[in-house]
Regions:
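Hydrophobic alpha-helical segments, chiefly the membrane-spanning helices
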Residues: 1-319
């Protein structure tokens, strides 16, 4: 009975986490829609908000060892589950030249930074700061490539904007679907919704981390294992659903922008910000399983980028 209660709290907390991220991101994008780089930053942060909130809640609750499993697990799931399901559904999933030449190296570079930062067993403040700076550089780079001067929250899920700013925009479109359709109609309402989203995010993340620890205790297993597996699968579900909707519209080229940029943002931003609050221990499980799996996933995806397509058979192999 205790396990059921913890799992119920965990499920409700994750749902609230996504809702809070939608509200906060919609409000932030409304206030920052005049500047392309600032707007892209808001979109990128919005895409990583669930993982970022969970990571900060883990650090502030005295469980920094959960941060890297959260990041690694969600990143591995984002690559294997999202790409696998998308390729299997699309039969042949194309990878456009921009992804292969710009976004694939971006992901590989992000993975290299994380690997070397975690090599000594702890990710320190200075390494976290480096990751945040790298994230900002990525934002400016992708914003410059998109050549977007201004946009509104509604433009975030509009086809024309997606085509121009695929790198960061599609990760939010995939995660939150049409969540921005209900954005605030005026500044006051946007501010209130943003504040409510921030509060909901904070509370949901705290309850999710506590429920994760409680469920792990009830099952007599390590919380790190649940963070790497259950959180990973849960985090990948919205991306899978969003990617399948994109494939149904036959806009196959947008899926890979979701995966490449979304995973890079997740690695740099979430790990970097969390490390600036507290040193992040890598842990035996993360070092022996998480990092090698993550490196293999990134390497496989990068190699697939050179072939410019992922076949249905490769998709099933990913799964």
């Amino acid at each position: 009975m205790e396990l059921f209660i913890w799992l119920l709290i965990f499920a409700v907390s994750l749902a609230a986490l996504l809702i809070g991220a939608v509200w906060f991101s919609a409000a932030a994008s409304r206030f920052l829609n005049k500047a392309a780089a600032a707007g892209f930053a808001a979109i990128a942060v919005g895409a990583a908000l669930p993982e970022l909130a969970l990571a900060l809640a883990a650090v502030l609750s005295g469980r920094p060892e959960l941060v890297l499993p959260i990041v690694l697990g969600s990143s591995v799931a984002n690559i294997f589950l999202v790409v696998g399901a998308s390729a299997a559904a699309a039969k042949n999933l194309p990878i456009v030249r921009e992804c292969a030449e710009a976004e694939a190296p971006l992901l590989a570079g992000s993975a290299a930074i994380l690997w070397f930062s975690a090599a000594d067993g702890i990710v320190f403040f200075e390494e976290g700061l480096l990751m945040v700076v790298a994230f900002l550089v990525c934002v400016v780079f992708l914003a410059a490539r998109g050549r977007i001067n201004r946009f509104t929250p509604r433009d975030i899920v509009a086809p024309g904007f997606l085509a121009a700013g695929r790198g960061l925009v599609e990760i939010v479109g995939a995660r939150f679907g049409r969540g921005f359709d209900g954005h605030a109609k005026n500044t006051a309402r946007a501010l209130l919704r943003g504040m409510a989203g921030a509060v909901l995010l904070a509370l949901a993340a705290i309850f999710a981390v506590e429920a994760l620890a409680g469920a792990a205790t009830a099952m007599a297993i390590s919380p790190v294992l649940l963070a790497f597996s259950v959180l990973a699968a849960t985090a990948a579900l919205p991306e899978i659903w969003g990617s399948l909707k994109i494939i149904a519209k036959k806009r196959y080229e947008l899926v890979m922008g979701n995966v490449f940029s979304g995973t890079a943002v997740n690695v740099l931003l979430v790990t970097g910000v969390a490390a600036m609050f507290s040193p992040l221990p890598v842990g035996a499980s993360a070092a022996a399983v998480g990092l090698p799996f993550f490196a293999a996933a990134v390497a496989l995806l990068t190699v697939s980028g050179f072939s410019r397509k992922i076949s249905s058979g490769q998709g099933w192999l990913y799964l």
